[in-house]
Amino acid sequence: MALTGYSWLLLSATFLNVGAEISITLEPAQPSEGDNVTLVVHGLSGELLAYSWYAGPTLSVSYLVASYIVSTGDETPGPAHTGREAVRPDGSLDIQGILPRHSGTYILQTFNRQLQTEVGYGHVQVHEILAQPTVLANSTALVERRDTLRLMCSSPSPTAEVRWFFNGGALPVALRLGLSPDGRVLARHGIRREEAGAYQCEVWNPVSVSRSEPINLTVYFGPERVAILQDSTTRTGCTIKVDFNTSLTLWCVSRSCPEPEYVWTFNGQALKNGQDHLNISSMTAAQEGTYTCIAKNTKTLLSGSASVVVKLSAAAVATMIVPVPTKPTEGQDVTLTVQGYPKDLLVYAWYRGPASEPNRLLSQLPSGTWIAGPAHTGREVGFPNCSLLVQKLNLTDTGRYTLKTVTVQGKTETLEVELQVAPLG
């Protein structure tokens, strides 16, 4: 009786299964998507009449891939045939361009001339070529110790293994503790500044690996350790001593991300300066006081401050006169700046020459009222701090100038300065 097609299946149901000698190996052993794969059969014995291959856990007709009659070479596809399978004369099964859906258990059933049947089992695991994953973040800018970081490795391959990278290396221990059981979600409560950087995830299987593009995380913090630094001047604790008519630059520094906004105050009054430094171009007694820098972080909504006291140096406290500029030329204005004038001043007077000659009086300032003297040319202006402005200098302004001061206690002091006016050209 000649049997073809599914009739072998009906016969196979009436005979006992014997011996488990058949073994099946896979070539290649770890196939990837698109490979040509062979389920190689070993241990066939006796003269066989037919083979049947099943792609499933049982010998159900619904799992039948194909039946093959040895004597004629006829192959009959079954319900589970995908168009890629072919049975070899030796019983092996070829699968062309294998796909992940071909993964699973395969059963070979053989029939001999005594109509006895044997079965062999094999397993196919097809590893797909992995697409590049993507890291998804709840936010890429977080506030330290306040916000939670949540990253997810998004991949169309649910069976792929996942590993994470931080700045190209392994995750720190604290971050590894926040991984989900499947490794696809990374959570970190109370993010730290040292955890700012580039994060990547990588998916892999035995035949393929793919890493995501980095996602960069910024962690905002501060301001902390706000301090005021200065250039080369004498400092004792929070007090800075400055020579008269010299310049001073104060720098406000802090640890902060992002860079904070700055506000400077002088003796409690806000200054029009939003920079990280403050320049005092020409130090006088009027600039003595407390300077405060306030640093404000617009992301963390935190702020910090530092203060210093700026004073004239001990050497500058003694009364002296300094021309500003020190080498004036014809046509310029010059200010005879008084350093260390008496705090209890009652009256002062400027003379063009010695104070012993009344006709040399330029101006005087008793009780806050400025009065011009006989030697006044209309170009001189006196100030409450004893300084004298001489405008539009000419060469005849060269010579001695004398300042006479009288305190409330009646103490009189006389100070002289020689003014040199350089000609133009």
Swiss-Prot record:
Residues 1-20 form the signal peptide. One of its GO terms (cellular component) is extracellular space. It comes from the Eukaryota. The gene is CEACAM16. Residues 133-218, 223-309 form the Ig-like C2-type domain. Disulfide bonds join 153-201, 252-293. It comes from Homo sapiens (Human). This is Cell adhesion molecule CEACAM16. Keywords: Deafness, Disease variant, Disulfide bond, Glycoprotein, Immunoglobulin domain, Non-syndromic deafness, Repeat, Secreted, Signal. SUPFAM superfamilies: Immunoglobulin. CDD domains: IgI_hCEACAM_2_4_6_like, IgV_CEACAM_D1.
